[in-house]
Amino acid sequence: MMRNRSKSPRRPSPTSRAANCDVELLKSTARDREELKCMLEKYERHLAEIQGNVKVLTSERDKTFLLYEQAQEEIARLRREMMKSCKSPKSTTAHAILRRVETERDVAFTDLRRMTTERDSLRERLKIAQETAFNEKAHLEQRIEELECTVHNLDDERMEQMANMTLMKETITTVEKEMKSLARKAMDTESELGRQKAENNSLRLLYENTEKDLSDTQRHLAKKKYELQLTQEKIMCLDEKIDNFTRQNIAQREEISILGATLNDLAKEKECLQACLDKKSENIASLGESLAMKEKTISGMKNIIAEMEQASRQSTEALIMCEQDISRMRRQLDETNDELGQIARERDILAHENDNLQEQFAKVKQENQALSKKLNDTHNELSDIKQKVQDTNLEVNKLKNILKSEESENRQIMEQLRKANEDAENWENKARQTEAENNTLKLELITAEAEGNRLKEKVDALNREVEQHLNAERSYKSQIATLHKSLVKMEEELQKVQFEKVSALADLSSTRELCIKLDSSKELLNRQLVAKDQEIEMMENELDSARSEIELLRSQMTNERISMQNLEALLVANRDKEYQSQIALQEKESEIQLLKEHLCLAENKMAIQSRDVAQFRNVVTQLEADLDITKRQLGTERFERERAVQELRRQNYSSNAYNLGPMKPNTKCHSPERAHHRSPDRGLDRSLEENLCYRDF
């Protein structure tokens, strides 16, 4: 039993093992019960035999008492007769014989007393043995009944435990199925949440970009309005100047020739500026080529992303295989969590660097806008350059989005690393490759920033040239102020001013058209923002619903965990009950063994009692032999006594015959002697008959 109990937790089917143990225990208890019944039957038979022997011994004892009383009566009668008889030598011999018979009688009497004491002791022993046997029999019968009741109770409990175990197995299977379905639902919800998070991130990026564009457009509008106000003020000033210039036309006509020379110089400078613009266009073409290279790298990144998705699918397949090794990987997850914390810190540092780069880009934009204020002549070309720069910024933002998506994918990869540590090395190599690619992208961003700095330097050079031109214009204006005398020149300058006024009005119309276009684009952007807000609200509602579903699933998981804990508690209770039942069975087996030991002791006692009975029988046989010897001695004594009586009769007869005559009157006195002589004969006849009956018995 101890071996079975120690090996029971290692075996796969404890219920079948417990059932087999219960069946074996029932069989063993039934066998023990049958053996006990057989032993009780044998013990009852033995007691019946002992009781029969006791009855026979009591009947023999009663008969011996009767014979002893008869012998005492005869001895007393013979003593009386001998005392009445006269004294003679034959009477002395008879007295000697009587004394010897009395001594033998005393010896026989002492033997009878000893036999009575032994018989009383045997009776007491038999009574004690009978009482102990009856008590043991009653105790054994009660014990057998208790064992039968316990066996029935154990059968009922075993059936109940089997039913409970079947119910528990069914509930466990159902709970496992529900857990699997819930795990699948949780995986689906997690995948959907990941997708929704990615979409939300993309929408947030788009929203941020649109907000930035709106802020830029609002700034442009404010700047344009300010420029319009400045142009209007300039127009007012120009009107005033025209009034002044009409007065000074005569003085300025003389200096028109000098201004024509200066205009030729300005044309040459304009050609130089066009050459610079050609160089800038070439630089823009080189930037386009670099953008094409970046697009190629982006396509390569997309291919890498596709490979990563395939690897993620393979990892999901590997996850199914790695669910069995989750318990082994929990220890390694802490180390990977630390590494992930370090990687997250590095990513935060990179994010701060990206923010700094964005701030630098914003500063570059502000500087470009300041340059756009100063460079009204090269505004269109610079606007094209700005559009290209914005395209590059969009591409940079796209690259940032790609980097963020790659970071999210890296997070997913790290989560997969938590679940499957065996593929960690491969994923780390891939992560290193992606980091190298990120480094290459960073280098490309640095090159783009360097190109932006070059463009800034070129713009600064252009600003310097513009300042030089402005200084020249100022010098020209000073010269024009000195040339107030030439009215003809002033009229030409008036025509030029009118031409500039027309161009300014054209610029105003173009700016107004641009403002209208910007307003329309603003409205479109507002509509897009409203639509995106609606989409974001829908996504938030979906997220709320998903969160509510997740909370419901969590509550279901908690309820299922509670039910599993209850089931485990029930299993533990059932195991405790089984253990207690096994302990009770062991105790009952120990009690059965104790009963067996008691039976062995009772058997030993019975054997000892049987030996004592055999000894008593031997003693009884010896006593019977002693009785036979005493009876023979009594027979010999009776025979001698009869001979003595016959001799006494002969002597009395001879004396009677010799004294017949004188003794006739005394016949009356002899009659009692005859009666006395006849009475012992009759007593002897009776004693002989009793001896014959005793021998026949």
Swiss-Prot record:
Tissue/organ expression: Predominantly expressed in testis, in spermatozoa (at protein level). Not detected in Leydig cells. The N-terminal 27-kDa fragment is also detected in liver, while the C-terminal 55-kDa fragment is also found retina, brain and kidney (at protein level).
Positions of the UniProt region annotated as Interaction with HIF1A: 556-688
GO CC terms in record: centriole; cytoplasm; motile cilium; neuron projection; sperm fibrous sheath; sperm principal piece
Chain positions found as Phosphoserine: 687
UniProt modification remark: Processed into N-terminal 27-kDa and C-terminal 55-kDa fragments.
GO molecular function, one term: structural molecule activity
Gene Ontology biological process: cell projection assembly
Subcellular location(s) of the protein: Cytoplasm; Cytoplasm, Cytoskeleton, Microtubule organizing center, Centrosome, Centriole
Subunit structure: Interacts with HIF1A.
PANTHER family reported in the protein's UniProt record: CENTROSOMAL PROTEIN CEP135 (PTHR20544), TESTIS SPECIFIC 10 (PTHR20544:SF2)
Function, as annotated: Plays a role in spermatogenesis. When overexpressed, prevents nuclear localization of HIF1A.
UniProt name for this protein: Testis-specific gene 10 protein
Organism: Mus musculus (Mouse)
Lineage per the UniProt record: Eukaryota, Metazoa, Chordata, Craniata, Vertebrata
Name of the coding gene: Tsga10
